[in-house]
């Protein structure tokens, strides 16, 4: 708290100017050094930050939330009209940590509401439970909005530079900026951090800073250093490097601009953390709410599960009498040893296998088939996205498999070559569904040229004309649905997803079927999305699936197996 001299200086600035400046400077230095002294304790606190242990989180099927930034709060909407607005004026969602979730609606709450509206509300709750927590990644670096934020706010910083360079300096914009920074710092604090709150309130006391500005001795550089020390104390580990880079900036305007930018990122970190910390509650609330809404609709329409029953019946029939396939055809990259194919279909049938087969069937669903399972209507668009992603991976893996059979381990032993070939193929197959023949013609030309150039760079013999023609022909044949290489890869990706549903993604990645090792990272992403979607759906509709599967599976088995225990 300010001492008596400082308080007297505020009341009589003309009589106690020297004492006030001296006293205030001492307090500010003490606050800055105090924040600086917390560096080591901050890192100690990181190691002891409360987090869900693997046992407690995974045992309940809840993903562990990342370490929280030290505080939370919301950005203000903008500076006053006297100054142009800076670039970090991000409009963030207003999220309050610890805010209670809305209670589940009671019986009859939607009594007069149309069913279509209730279904829409259920879908919105369903979407909220799957909210993307990485908000800052939503915009491309080359997007129009991103470019605008880089160019337009330069007016503010140019204006600030002109004001600080004037004789005498004009601190009006600097004061508005310091006020905004102060509020951001305060918003990053937790309620229990009262000592830090008092430090910030004292060091960035706007009344006193206005007095200094009126006298022309406001030390912007010194205040910036204090703010940096406080940011070191408050930022999440991911921002340490960015804050450290700011310490090397000597120009006051560039430093303030960097501070404001990093503070915006720190705010986003807190929003992301708050959302992630609420995910388990959102998911649990979503499960209960979706099930209650579905049961209400089922009570009014007993035929609501007809399509779901037909969907599961078809899956069980496929497992009892599987159709022949070319899955056993070997490819040049396959290796000896066990793979997920060794655990293909257990006998007799189990609820897990019927459900996994049913979920996989949705990835090849005929768009004209209107008998889509009622329990998965809210996820239909997500399933279509997964289908598109899986189809692109099928084409990518097929291209890599064919290319490796011609160039061998010489080129495909180079991670740089494989990554380059994957980038080329990925960029070209995005339009595969609309024009497969044309796309594969381009892919075959690009891949052949890449192989030829790489062999030449390594001093190796290029492909013969015969091998080149054969490579181009095999790559172009991938455009046909009946192509056996494409069919093999497609079935193996489906088998991988089935293993993910039963065993989990990490265990399924340990023994990938032949031909899939080069797309392991992409498969892991696909598998995680598939498992997340299907497990949530299973949790919501487990009671209904259990009742349906009782009529499809040997009753003796079902007595000891329940869908909910998978």
Curated annotation (Swiss-Prot):
GO cellular component: acrosomal vesicle; membrane; sperm flagellum; sperm midpiece
PTM annotation, UniProt: Constitutively phosphorylated on serine, threonine and tyrosine residues within the head and tail regions of noncapacitated spermatozoa. Phosphorylation on tyrosine residues increases upon sperm capacitation within the acrosomal region in a protein kinase A (PKA)-dependent signaling pathway.
Comp. bias regions, Basic and acidic residues: 1-24
Recorded topology in the membrane: Single-pass membrane protein
Transmembrane segments: 393-413
Quaternary structure annotation from Swiss-Prot or TrEMBL: Found in a complex at least composed of MROH2B isoform 2, PRKACA isoform 2 and TCP11. Interacts with MROH2B isoform 2. Interacts with PRKACA isoform 2. Interacts with ODF1 (via leucine zipper motif).
Protein name: T-complex protein 11 homolog
């Amino acid at each position: 708290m300010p001492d008596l001299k400082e308080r007297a200086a505020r009341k009589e600035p003309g009589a106690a100017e020297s004492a006030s400046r001296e006293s205030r400077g001492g307090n500010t230095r003490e606050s800055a050094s105090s924040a600086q002294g917390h560096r080591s304790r901050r890192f100690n606190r990181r190691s002891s930050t409360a987090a869900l242990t693997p046992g407690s989180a995974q045992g309940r099927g809840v993903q562990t939330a990342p370490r929280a930034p030290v505080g939370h709060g919301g950005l203000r909407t903008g500076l006053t009209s006297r100054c142009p607005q800076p670039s970090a004026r991000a409009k963030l969602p207003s999220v309050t940590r610890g805010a209670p979730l809305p209670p589940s609606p009671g019986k009859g709450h939607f009594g007069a509401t149309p069913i279509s509206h209730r279904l829409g509300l259920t879908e919105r709750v369903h979407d909220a439970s799957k909210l993307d927590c990485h908000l800052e990644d939503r915009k491309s670096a080359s997007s129009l909005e991103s470019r605008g934020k880089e160019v337009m706010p330069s007016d503010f910083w140019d204006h600030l530079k002109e004001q600080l360079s004037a004789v005498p300096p004009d601190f009006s914009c600097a004061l508005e900026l310091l006020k905004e920074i102060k509020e951001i710092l305060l918003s990053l604090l937790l309620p229990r951090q009262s000592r830090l709150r008092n430090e910030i309130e004292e060091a960035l006391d706007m009344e006193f800073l206005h007095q200094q500005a009126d006298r022309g001795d406001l030390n912007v550089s010194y205040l910036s250093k204090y703010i940096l020390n406080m940011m070191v104390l408050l930022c999440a580990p991911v921002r340490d490097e960015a804050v450290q880079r700011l310490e090397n900036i000597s120009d006051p305007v560039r430093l303030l601009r960097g501070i404001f930018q990093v503070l915006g990122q720190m705010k986003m970190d807190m929003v992301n953390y708050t959302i992630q910390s609420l995910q388990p509650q959102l998911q649990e609330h979503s499960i209960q709410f979706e099930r209650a809404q579905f049961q209400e609709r089922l009570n009014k329409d007993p035929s609501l599960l007809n399509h779901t029953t037909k969907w599961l019946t078809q899956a069980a029939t496929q497992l009892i009498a599987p159709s022949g396939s070319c899955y056993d055809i070997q490819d040049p990259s396959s290796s000896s040893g066990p793979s997920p194919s060794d655990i293909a279909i257990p006998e007799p049938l189990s609820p897990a296998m019927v459900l996994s087969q049913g979920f996989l069937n949705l990835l090849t669903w005929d768009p004209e088939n209107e008998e889509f399972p009622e329990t998965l209507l809210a996820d239909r668009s997500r399933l279509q996205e997964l289908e598109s992603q899986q189809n692109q991976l099928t084409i990518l893996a097929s291209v890599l498999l064919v290319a490796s059979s011609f160039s061998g381990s010489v080129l495909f032993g180079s991670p740089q070559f494989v990554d380059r070939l994957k980038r080329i193929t990925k960029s070209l197959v995005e339009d595969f569904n609309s024009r497969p023949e044309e796309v594969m013609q381009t892919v075959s030309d690009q891949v052949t040229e890449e192989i030829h150039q790489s062999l030449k760079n390594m001093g190796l013999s290029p492909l013969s004309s015969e091998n080149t023609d054969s490579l181009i022909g095999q790559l172009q044949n991938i455009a046909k649905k009946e192509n056996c290489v494409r069919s093999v890869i497609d079935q193996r990706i489906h088998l991988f997803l089935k293993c993910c549903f039963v065993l989990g993604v990490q265990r399924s990645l340990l023994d990938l079927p032949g031909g899939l090792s080069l797309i392991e990272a992409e498969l892991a992403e696909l598998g995680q999305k598939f498992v997340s979607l299907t497990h949530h759906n299973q949790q919501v509709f487990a009671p209904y699936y259990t009742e349906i599967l009782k009529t499809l599976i040997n009753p003796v088995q079902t007595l000891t197996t329940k869908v909910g225990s998978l």
